[in-house]
Amino acid sequence: MKKLNIIFAGTPDFAATHLQALLNSEHNVIAVYTQPDKPAGRGKKLQASPVKQLAEVHHIPVYQPKSLRKEEAQAELQALNADVMVVVAYGLILPEAVLKAPKYGCLNVHGSLLPRWRGAAPIQRSIWAGDTETGVTIMQMDIGLDTGDMLHKVTTPILATETSASLYAKLAELAPPALLEVLNGLTSGQFKPEKQQDEQANYAEKLTKEEAKLDWNMTACQLERNIRAFNPAPMAYLTLMVNEVEERIKVYQAEVLPHQEKTVGTVLAVDKNGIQIATQQGVLNITQLQPAGKKPMSVQDFLNGRGDWFKVGSVL
């Protein structure tokens, strides 16, 4: 195994997990690229990314260009003379000059089994679509969006209770060892590049707040998947009128019950076991929810003091 000089590019916690794995390895992280500090919290103070915070602890030079399209930024990166650049949830587009700068190019850790889900939200979309398995792909980056040759894949099942939060955590454990395997075998050609089958690709669009609103014209199965896919953000929700005020309630957990021939959105039953609502196909039984300004709670706790919010026979 050849010890590699690595540039690491990433921003959130998921990326920091990979940076830590590289720091624990035999390889040498010579520089870190991350997004510029951004205002956060109530005071809107500038907040360094998790990757920057970790890099500074280990006294690694940090670069935070707003863009890598400018020649000065590209020249600065090329001057580092890296063997390879590892990119994990960085958030900036890499021009061709950057992709070609390191000796072995740029490797990306992608949170799906390519080419199934390309794009910004592969973890969430795999749950949303009802996939039964997912994983991580280590790929050689090219100028396309997640279109590069695949070097290594590791799979994991998607459980029936999986949320985006739990799957994110699972992939954060799975991915760093897979990345290290590829890096350790990079110079020996152990991992053969495999072309993606473009016709099998789907684009994993970011989840929107509009999409997060539960639509009773969907099936109960799809709504239940949405609830899990949209957790922890932007969180699935429903609205209902309470004393002429629209209440917005986040939904954390639900289950699918057999279909009843009722108008979609009809409240069928309300008790400690759940709030049952008719959908286009099947009944959605909501078991955990969160009223505005409160913590997530069971239906039983929700109904204490709010027993008249959901009226049996009413249509949401």
From Swiss-Prot:
Presence of the UniProt keyword Transferase in the record: yes
GO cellular component terms, A-Z: cytosol
Keyword Membrane: no
Binding site for (6S)-5,6,7,8-tetrahydrofolate: 112-115
GO molecular function, one term: methionyl-tRNA formyltransferase activity
Keywords: Protein biosynthesis, Transferase
EC number: 2.1.2.9
Catalytic activity: L-methionyl-tRNA(fMet) + (6R)-10-formyltetrahydrofolate = N-formyl-L-methionyl-tRNA(fMet) + (6S)-5,6,7,8-tetrahydrofolate + H(+)
Function of the molecule: Attaches a formyl group to the free amino group of methionyl-tRNA(fMet). The formyl group appears to play a dual role in the initiator identity of N-formylmethionyl-tRNA by promoting its recognition by IF2 and preventing the misappropriation of this tRNA by the elongation apparatus.
Protein family per UniProt: Belongs to the Fmt family.
Listed name of the protein: Methionyl-tRNA formyltransferase
